């Protein structure tokens, strides 16, 4: 049985399936904010890239991005997406990357969750979210962009490619970066020198205003 349920700005079809009744949404006809909310609600948990960039005026920009992941190790590559603002304009992070082509990704950890969230606030381009969050910086080793002094992990990166995926509000811009230097604090390592997730304590994003911890662990042997 198939019928159409109309909700504000979103045409939703409901159909029977083995998993029970379900919504069926066509992104080409649905409102962009609704598509966004559904997407971030189902693609979870999303790791957070806590990114510093440097403006031409020398202002250190800091912002979190949950459209993020690692995509290879030889060479080490990370990808994140600073989407366009709701008015279609580019965020400071993207503008800085287009000019300088360097950035640093930091681990977003539980002890720093409040600062991560605070750094998502939009401020004028001549103001630094690093100052707003009460954080310190350390000079980069291979890039001109400073890294956060408080973050236990920092990945210095150079931009390999920026791929625009649209021109409208919340359109993606895939930033492909090669990791050229890594900083990992001893305090998050185990006896073998590997990162211990129970010590690193990263946080991740869910839908809406929800976040999650990564401390509820289980292991599965690879087949």
Indicate residue ranges for each PLM-predicted region.
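Basic, polyanion-binding surface patches
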Residues: 20-223
